[in-house]
């Protein structure tokens, strides 16, 4: 009996030593990061300068004093830029008549308190005012602002299944701005088609990933084989120890969304592996 217990204890100890050795190996070996181009380093440096990625144009104050977010409006773009921000995430979708507009869903745009149809015509979209006062924005208006302000970078958030088709339209219409559009992909399969279009800067964003894709070791292996600006995830998922270990192993910086508590925002930026944080706060 004593001998059997000793064997069991020995096996348990051996398994623990093997597991500890494996973890030590993962912590100590050099991350297998995909070679990073100077362009990607420049984009990362631009994001890291403040760590702030303004989400959907950021907060605005209405005439009644209400603080609102998610407008993707021209007013929000101008406001966040005047506050000194140079990296902005913008939602983009296509209207019923094929015009690219800056909106998460046109049903969220209010005209005198009434929702527009889910996919409005472009003239209807532009004739309304968001929250009764803010100017809706087309991608044509956005790119004109980008050309007037050459230090501005735009991270795309493209609605539902339109990612590749919208990126193709941007590439065909605004080829001179492709290096300043940072494209978010939502599935591994989107990387190659979008990269082949000529977009050099890609972020892998996990909020639409399915359960299989959200395996962080799988994500780590994907990052080791593809050039990425960053991986964007929710902090609650990242802080699970196995997920954190996988992300740190691949060497690609992490970004979090969306954090509107100022103290938490600054605290997260102190972590060496965090490149930036999406936030509605503009100053």
Functional labels for PLM-detected ranges:
Residues 2-283:
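Phosphate-group recognition and catalysis centered on beta-loop-alpha active-site segments
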């Amino acid at each position: 009996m004593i001998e059997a217990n000793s064997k069991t204890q020995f096996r348990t100890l051996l398994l623990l030593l093997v597991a500890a050795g494996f973890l030590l190996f993962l912590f100590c070996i050099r991350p297998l990061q995909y070679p990073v181009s100077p362009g990607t380093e420049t984009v990362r440096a631009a994001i890291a300068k403040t760590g702030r990625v303004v989400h959907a144009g950021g907060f605005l104050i209405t005439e009644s004093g209400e603080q609102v977010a998610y407008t993707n409006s021209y007013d929000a773009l101008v406001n966040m830029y005047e506050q000194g921000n140079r990296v902005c995430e913008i939602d983009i979708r296509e209207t019923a008549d094929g015009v690219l507009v800056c909106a998460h869903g046109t049903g969220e745009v209010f005209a005198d308190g009434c929702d527009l149809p889910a996919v409005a015509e472009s003239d209807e979209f532009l004739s309304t005012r968001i929250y009764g006062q803010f100017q809706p924005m087309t991608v044509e208006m956005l790119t004109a602002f980008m050309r007037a302000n050459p230090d501005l970078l735009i991270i795309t958030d493209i609605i539902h299944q339109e990612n590749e088709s919208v990126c193709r339209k941007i590439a065909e219409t605004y080829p001179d701005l492709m290096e300043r559009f940072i494209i978010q992909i939502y599935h591994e399969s989107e990387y190659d088609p979008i990269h082949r279009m000529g977009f050099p800067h890609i972020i892998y964003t996990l909020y639409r990933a399915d359960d299989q894709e959200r395996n962080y070791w799988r994500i780590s292996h994907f990052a080791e084989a593809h050039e990425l600006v960053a991986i964007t995830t929710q902090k609650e998922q990242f802080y699970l120890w196995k997920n954190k270990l996988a992300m740190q192993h691949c060497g690609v910086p992490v970004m979090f969304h969306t954090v509107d508590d100022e103290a938490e925002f600054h605290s997260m930026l102190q972590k060496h592996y965090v490149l930036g944080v999406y936030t509605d706060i503009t100053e």
